[in-house]
């Protein structure tokens, strides 16, 4: 009997007391450290009109970005078509990350800047129809010894974007990745501009299925000024609308909302 009591105390201490105390202290410290502007730009907020007309209006310092790449993108037919689409909510990625936490975010901190993610990703989101387009530029420091972008980074971009695409359609506007399936077709050379396209395929209660892919950014510039850049398929007589963009990878994401998330709707923690 004398040995049983210490054993039970150790069991309760390890299984109940210590985990509860650790969780309580962790949540308390986390919430205290969370910036005051954390809830300013959450997915629960109404869309604000006309945040951006030009990609140069960035929340990230322009000295950390490739201005020449931004200029090329702004002249492209793809960008202008998206920017003029009234269904699309146009923001920069940094606008969705609280300013106090950007430096700790992988894509906005560790992997952002010259030689890395060289522009603040341009986001076009049709929330009602579950469609998302994001434009990135992948710098030279994101490559392996063969000069191709690391697959781990591409996996991160796909996971993050597909979740972002599906979050607004979940009951509590947030969830977790239950499964992410990836398939890579071709390597992406460094110093390449790419487009990520995603769309929600199925939404059922607390479960959401999203598909997406990475493709090459088209080099043709917009014809809004009446001219186009040199493009051999056009010279040879091919219709640019019939050309298929090169796909580098595709992904399928199953997003779920844990039942207990509904109790934290009031807390803009995540």
From Swiss-Prot:
This is MIOREX complex component 3. Keywords: Mitochondrion, Transit peptide. The gene is MRX3. The keyword Transit peptide applies. It holds the Pfam family 4HBT. Associates with the mitochondrial ribosome. It comes from the Eukaryota. Component of MIOREX complexes, large expressome-like assemblies of ribosomes with factors involved in all the steps of post-transcriptional gene expression. Present with 704 molecules/cell in log phase SD medium. Residues 1-12 form a transit peptide. The keyword Lyase does not apply. It is found in: Mitochondrion. InterPro entries: HotDog_dom_sf (IPR029069), PTE-AB_protein (IPR052061), Thioestr_dom (IPR006683). It comes from Saccharomyces cerevisiae (strain ATCC 204508 / S288c) (Baker's yeast). Its main location: mitochondrion. GO terms for cellular component: mitochondrial inner membrane; mitochondrion.
